Amino acid sequence: MKTIAVIGWKNSGKTTLVSNLVKFYKEKKIKVGVVKHAHHSFDIDHPNTDSYKIRKSGAYKTTLVSDKRLALMEEKITPDIQLGSLIDLNKDCDLLIFEGFKSYDELIKLEVHIKKNDKDYLYKSINNVKYLVTDDDLDHPIQTFNHSQIDKIASEIYNENS
């Protein structure tokens, strides 16, 4: 399976780029999984549902299944994230896109940057950043694209990464 991490400062366009890449790959019949890093606690389940009651009773894993969707909720015992486990959960995908995960050196990264954020480039301080998507006109020491080059970005990611 091919993997890539899309990183960048808040409001740089990461989610927009990931969504556009997913649409591009879907048209090409490439099965894409996305793992989104959340910096805050979240809950996809709701009180007064059977699954919520089961999970709150102490189930380590609760899986909801319908004819159209599957959701797995796993209670984390430790705060660390096991990259291998996330990859295993998505092993039926052709490409796995991680949104965030900039501290994971083993992932090849694509940085999304916009001038108006007035932030420095992450590739200067983060390991394994191979691509940059930006709206500036500067020369950079890594392969650079503009935000509208979705087909070129998608092709480069899929053809070069493994």
Segments from the language model and where they lie:
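The conserved Walker
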Residues: 10
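Phosphate-binding/switch loop-helix module in NTP-utilizing enzymes
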Residues: 74-104
